C-alpha cells in the first residue's frame, strides 16, 4: 500500500482516487479552495466515490481536502490530474 495524493478533484481525479483506493492504497484527494463545493459534496457522502463502468465499487478516500499541505503530507506518489487549461491556478 502506498500513500498517494491526487491533485484536482474533477472527473479524472475522482476516478483515479477511487480506483487507487479500491486497489488498497491510502489516498488523499485535493482541489483548490475555489472548488470547495466539489470537496464538500464528496465529504457529505462520507468521503466515498462510486465507480460504475469497467471498474465498479464504492471507494472510501482517506482525506478529501482543500489544504494542499495536508494532502501532500507523507505522500509517496503524487498524481496531478488537472486539465492543461486549469493547471496555472495550481501554481499561482
Predicted features along the sequence, with ranges:
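Short, flexible active-site loop motifs that bind/organize anionic cofactors or intermediates
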Residues: 2, 61, 77
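NAD(P)+-binding Rossmann beta1-loop-alpha1 motif at the extreme N-terminus of oxidoreductases
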Residues: 1-53
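Short, functional N-terminal and low-complexity linear motifs
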Residues: 5-11, 57-61, 89
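Rossmann-like NAD(P)(H) cofactor-binding subdomain of soluble oxidoreductases
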Residues: 79-80, 84-92
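Short acidic low-complexity segments
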Residues: 54-55, 60-74
Amino acid at each position: 500500500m502506498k500513500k498517494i495524493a491526487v491533485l484536482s478533484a474533477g472527473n479524472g481525479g475522482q476516478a483515479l482516487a477511487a480506483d487507487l483506493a479500491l486497489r488498497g492504497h491510502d489516498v488523499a484527494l485535493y482541489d483548490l479552495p475555489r472548488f470547495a463545493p466539489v470537496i464538500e459534496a464528496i465529504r457529505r457522502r462520507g468521503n466515498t466515490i462510486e465507480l460504475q463502468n469497467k471498474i465498479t465499487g464504492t471507494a472510501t478516500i482517506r482525506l478529501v481536502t482543500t489544504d494542499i499541505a495536508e494532502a501532500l503530507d507523507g505522500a509517496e506518489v503524487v498524481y496531478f490530474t488537472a486539465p492543461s487549461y486549469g493547471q496555472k491556478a495550481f501554481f499561482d
